[in-house]
Amino acid sequence: MDTKTLIASEIAKVVPELEQDAIFNLLETPKNSDMGDLAFPAFSLAKVLRKAPQMIASELAEQIDESQFEKVVAVGPYINFFLDKAKISSQVLEQVITAGSDYAQQDEGQGRNVAIDMSSPNIAKPFSIGHLRSTVIGDSLAHIFAKMGYQPVKINHLGDWGKQFGMLIVAYKKWGDEAAVQAHPIDELLKLYVRINAEAETDPTVDEEAREWFRKLEDGDKEATELWQWFRDESLLEFNRLYDQLHVTFDSYNGEAFYNDKMDEVLELLEAKNLLVESKGAQVVNLEKYGIEHPALIKKSDGATLYITRDLAAALYRKRTYDFAKSVYVVGNEQAAHFKQLKAVLQEMGYDWSDDMTHVAFGLVTKGGAKLSTRKGNVILLEPTVAEAINRAASQIEAKNPNLADKEAVAHAVGVGAIKFYDLKTDRMNGYDFDLETMVSFEGETGPYVQYAHARIQSILRKADFTPSATTTYSLADAESWEIIKLIQDFPRIIKRTSDNFEPSIMAKFAINLAQSFNKYYAHTRILDDNSERDNRLALCYATATVLKEALRLLGVDAPNEM
């Protein structure tokens, strides 16, 4: 139990008028440590108990069991709690040393499934930095949910259907070179895609021709289907090579095309429930009672189904297949209206499990302040960017540690980790400007900074030849050790907050705080001095490294033992 929860539970025993959660939220950290570690303001009880806050604080301080604390004192309207630092540090260190990487493992999920719709790049288009956010946020959440006791199911809902394939077929038939596409599939397909879009801006017949080819594809035309399958196969080979570099795996690659034969059932269900309304020849579902002004367009006047119809089919399939406890869609914030409609239509259909669906939205990545666009050819391609990040990491490692063994593997861990960490430390609803130099820096709030703190601790433990014993009692009470102990003790709560808020930046910021606290401790403490505190300090180092490594793992970032 963390100290805040402990204090809240002790206060709740003597204040039945307040729920423990309410007490927890009222606890404050005094600005001056001389006033204790945590304080409870009694103002909120004044009306209920009809007494002055000062009197309430004084009376309650007398009633609270002090055995868990160094002391409990009333100061004005506050009850100040002084924690027994030696006792708590001993408990925390024992927990980490005993559990190792399983420290803070939780059982909220009880093995239930969480479906995570993530990454989902478009076939025949390059994997750009724009897709990175969905990929790394989804991957981190998968690790977090597993730590909370859920079974994550990572779904790559590939963009392998739609009018863009009509455009691409038109472009390929006009200008395509089979040998060139086979040699460099994504590069060639991107050139064709950008060129046909540029032509479509001045020639309206291009759109008509593309729509016709896409209709042929929907009808199973042999030539259209063969071209589509070829574009898909070549793109997937390229994507999987990139996923390997990012150390990201998936449980399903069922994309948009997978649901082609599953949409009729959606239409039948909507018709059976009398939810479809005709509007200008199209079929829609009105959602005004959910506060959604625009109806959900299910089927166009030409008979073509839409994105939402496909997502309804996917939601039904996933519930039947995985019986998920949660279903999350890691998709850009520009799709917010779509996901509101999706949930509302499912609610209208009578599916209560739609409450378990969450749109995990995120902001845009820009470059030099400009929005990225595949159609206009303004993209940052991931593959060369990852290669450059690895090279930058390798240069810094060479300068810091020229004799390091396995330099290539470490440079890969640092370069890829730098890109992932920078993305994840940004509150997901915020965008960020892509700047590789800042990302790969060993200074500042970066992945390499946190990785280097972990590697530094491993170096100390190697020099000391220290392995902690689960049967030995380790204890520390100095101020800088205490800052680290408090963070380590808070790790289970950080994991839960990250999970509850679908917000990996909470975990990334925790990792930065822990690395900074350790570096401050390292600068002011002679850890390896042969005195009575040596083993206690080394046990703290061991626990810090264990939690840092696990925090990075939960972000999908490796923690090298040497850098």
From Swiss-Prot:
Gene3D superfamilies membership: Arginyl tRNA synthetase N-terminal domain (3.30.1360.70), HUPs (3.40.50.620), Isoleucyl-tRNA Synthetase, Domain 1 (1.10.730.10)
Pfam families recorded: Arg_tRNA_synt_N, DALR_1, tRNA-synt_1d
GO biological process, any: arginyl-tRNA aminoacylation
Domain of life: Bacteria
Subunit organization: Monomer.
Keyword Electron transport attached: no
Keywords of this entry: Aminoacyl-tRNA synthetase, ATP-binding, Cytoplasm, Ligase, Nucleotide-binding, Protein biosynthesis
Entry annotated with the keyword ATP-binding: yes
GO MF terms held by the record: arginine-tRNA ligase activity; ATP binding
UniProt protein name: Arginine--tRNA ligase
Reactions listed under catalytic activity: tRNA(Arg) + L-arginine + ATP = L-arginyl-tRNA(Arg) + AMP + diphosphate
Source organism of the structure: Streptococcus pyogenes serotype M4 (strain MGAS10750)
Gene behind this protein: argS
Residue ranges of the motif 'HIGH' region: 121-131
TM segment ranges: none
Alphabetical list of SMART domains matching this protein: Arg_tRNA_synt_N, DALR_1
GO cellular component, one term: cytoplasm
Protein EC: 6.1.1.19
